[in-house]
């Protein structure tokens, strides 16, 4: 079985016998039901392949669709002129980078269909290209724009440049409305949907498919599709990892499923990660190998965002569906970029509860954030997560605390604002990362932060104080009886009181007490 990893051409996919999860029935429905569409989905979710599939369909390439659902549905297979603008191929850091891209595409189209020498602006030239393409071929035009939002995403944090991009693209896309009589179909795709003064404000007849239940599986794969199309690699993956097929499916679901684009919707798998897993027969973090956009961290830092709120956010459809570039709320960007997804829906109030879609995204995103909030880097051996976990599994609380203290003392404070927020965010990240390897319960409320960490042979109860005392923290563990759930547990128990100095921005004291108490010792 050949897996179309990175294959964005439908023609190449079909001619070279790559596996294809058939989405053509939905493509046919879109073509029959309407004319203008918009779709946002996370990166690496198959948007470009979808655009290529639609291009092949409207080019009348019946030969490429043999055996697929649309082969039985479509009778005419008309060939339409296609205007395909792919904005994903460039890096946009100046106005010229965008105008050069539009100029190149317009020149190509004008050579094919004709040019009006009087037309000067991009928008006017585009209008004439649409009209001339119709007049020359006798068929209405199909317009496909892939990653329409990439210029604006790369300009997040630069409001002036973003406004320039918006002004250019707003007029350019507005040509679709003025030339409606010459157009058969139009689809614009991207990662995000920008609101307020949108590039689509002149094109108000777009149907947004992003939260349309009928097309929630237009990109990505459902569990049924995974089982139907990939039985062979699932069996091979099970054998390679010494798992049953049921265990393999459960692990795939935990790792790569979990995207929900509508309320009470079905779970959608990330296709890129899934195909890489089948190709390599190894569970990995493939989505993050292709890079995490730095603008996400910039948004979180800009607002001094409280990271624990990532999995506690409640939002409305209006917020999820639209990004305001001057807003300090990063939630809509994180949702549309695929780092958060819908976990629950309150129909009475129209509210969505958000969270990480799956283990791959949660682990990868938190690992990506670690260097920005702590001194923990993968390349810094003393602070590697493996050594943290090694200390915990081997019953070395003193070494563990030394590493924790060193972690906070080695942080780049230039990016840190509020000291308490800094500690809360760093505390959250370290606890969550340890939670992928050990059982960790974290509590943060009323100025109190604590951890309960469980390994096979050891239990650690850790109480933190901010500008307090390690002795008081340890005393609170004993007085509140935080160790009571483990009194009958055969594992070794350690109680640890820790103080974090907000002024020094470091852990300045801790106290460790084995239980049952056989003597306590201090670190000052």
Which residues does each predicted region cover?
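Domain-level recognition of nuclease-like catalytic cores that cleave nucleotide substrates
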Residues: 485, 491-524
């Amino acid at each position: 079985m050949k897996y179309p990893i990175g294959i964005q051409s439908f023609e190449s996919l079909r001619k070279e016998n790559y596996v294809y999860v058939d989405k053509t029935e939905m493509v046919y429905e879109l073509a029959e039901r309407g004319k203008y569409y918009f779709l946002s989905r996370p990166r690496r979710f198959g948007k470009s392949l979808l655009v290529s599939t639609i291009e092949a369909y409207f080019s009348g390439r019946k030969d490429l669709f043999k055996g697929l659902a649309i082969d039985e549905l479509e009778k005419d297979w008309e060939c339409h002129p296609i205007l395909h603008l792919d904005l994903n191929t460039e890096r946009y850091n100046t106005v010229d980078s965008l105008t050069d891209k539009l100029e190149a595409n317009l020149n190509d189209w004008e050579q094919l269909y004709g040019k009006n020498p009087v037309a000067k602006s991009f928008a006017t030239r585009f209008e004439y290209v649409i009209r001339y393409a119709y007049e020359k071929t006798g068929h209405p035009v199909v317009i496909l724009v892939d990653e329409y939002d990439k210029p604006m995403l790369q300009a997040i944090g630069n409001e002036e440049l973003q406004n320039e991009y918006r002004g250019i693209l707003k007029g350019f896309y507005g040509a679709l409305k003025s030339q409606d009589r010459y157009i058969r179909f139009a689809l614009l795709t991207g990662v995000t949907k920008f609101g307020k003064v949108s590039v689509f404000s002149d094109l108000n007849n777009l149907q947004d498919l992003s939260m349309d239940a009928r097309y929630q599986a237009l990109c990505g794969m459902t569990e049924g599709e995974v089982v139907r199309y990939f039985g062979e690699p699932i069996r091979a993956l099970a054998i390679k990892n010494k798992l049953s097929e049921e265990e393999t499916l459960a692990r795939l679901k935990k790792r790569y499923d979990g995207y929900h684009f509508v309320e009470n919707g079905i779970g959608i798998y990330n296709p890129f990660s899934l195909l890489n897993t089948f190709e390599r027969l190894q569970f990995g973090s493939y989505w993050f190998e292709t890079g995490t956009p730095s603008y996400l961290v910039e948004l979180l830092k800009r607002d001094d965002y409280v990271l624990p709120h990532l999995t506690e956010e409640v939002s409305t459809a209006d917020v999820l569906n639209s990004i305001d570039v001057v807003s300090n709320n990063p939630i809509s960007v994180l949702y549309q970029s695929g780092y958060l997804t819908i976990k629950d829906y309150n129909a009475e109030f129209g509210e969505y509860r958000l969270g990480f879609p799956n283990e791959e995204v949660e682990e990868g995103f938190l690992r990506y954030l670690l260097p920005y909030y702590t001194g923990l880097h993968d390349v810094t051996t003393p602070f590697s997560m493996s050594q943290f976990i090694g200390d915990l599994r081997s019953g070395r609380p003193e070494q563990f605390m030394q590493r924790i203290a060193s972690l906070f003392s080695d942080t780049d404070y230039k990016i840190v604002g509020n000291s308490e927020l800094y500690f809360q965010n760093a505390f959250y990240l370290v606890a969550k990362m340890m939670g992928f390897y050990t059982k960790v319960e974290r509590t943060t409320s009323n100025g109190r932060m604590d951890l309960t960490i469980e390994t096979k042979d050891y239990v650690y109860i850790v109480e933190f104080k901010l500008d307090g005392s390690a002795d008081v923290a340890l005393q609170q563990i004993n007085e509140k009886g935080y160790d009571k759930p483990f009194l009958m547990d055969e594992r070794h128990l350690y109680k640890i009181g820790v103080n974090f100095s907000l002024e020094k921005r470091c852990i300045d004291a801790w106290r460790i007490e084995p239980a049952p108490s056989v003597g306590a010792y201090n670190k000052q």
